[in-house]
Amino acid sequence: MSKPSDRINLTNQFLIAMPNMADPTFSGTVVYLCDHSERGALGLVINRPTDIDLESLFNRIDLKLEIEPLLHIPVYFGGPVQTERGFVLHEPVEGANYSSSMSVEGGLEMTTSKDVLEAVATGTGPKRFLLTLGHAGWGAGQLEEEISRNGWLTVAADPRIVFDTPAEERFEAALGLLGVSSSTLSGEAGHA
């Protein structure tokens, strides 16, 4: 049994699905880990845009989005847990105090309250953000077990991949942080 001090904290890391990922929900995904502790882990898939854009989502929740460049930004599938709930991964906004926000070690924030969307709609919210429906969640020890079975690679997250890289390039970009590409990655691995 490992001591709490022996635990690896994967908060603010990317999880990159290995080619042998059996769960189609996560096949080919990059997950940004917002929280990882002895209680479990919570993350957001950052490379699965849905066919819903910000304009239609905002209309659905009775908000008027008036910033033209934002209208057709896609909403992402964040994971299979709470898929009707919005999660906004964003850079901190100076002076903002959203009612349900969590600072992620490393500089980003994740907010689940409607006030961040109200701020986005009026142009006073975060300038760089990613909105997902749903999140990925793991119980105590579950993620560590999946990693030990070679289900995931991990690497320190880079906000430029989250906010500046096109969705279809994020998987390769995250792998690039490790110096590998999907063409050189094998689903087979050994343990010494």
Curated annotation (Swiss-Prot):
Q: What superkingdom does the record give?
A: Bacteria
What SUPFAM superfamilies does this protein's entry cite?
VC0467-like
InterPro entries per UniProt? AlgH-like
Q: Name one GO cellular component term.
A: cytosol
Which Pfam families does the protein's record reference? DUF179 (PF02622)
- Give the intrachain disulfide bonds: none
Q: Which family does it belong to?
A: Belongs to the UPF0301 (AlgH) family.
Q: What is this protein called?
A: UPF0301 protein Bmul_2524/BMULJ_00714
Q: Which organism is it from?
A: Burkholderia multivorans (strain ATCC 17616 / 249)
The lineage is: Bacteria, Pseudomonadati, Pseudomonadota, Betaproteobacteria, Burkholderiales
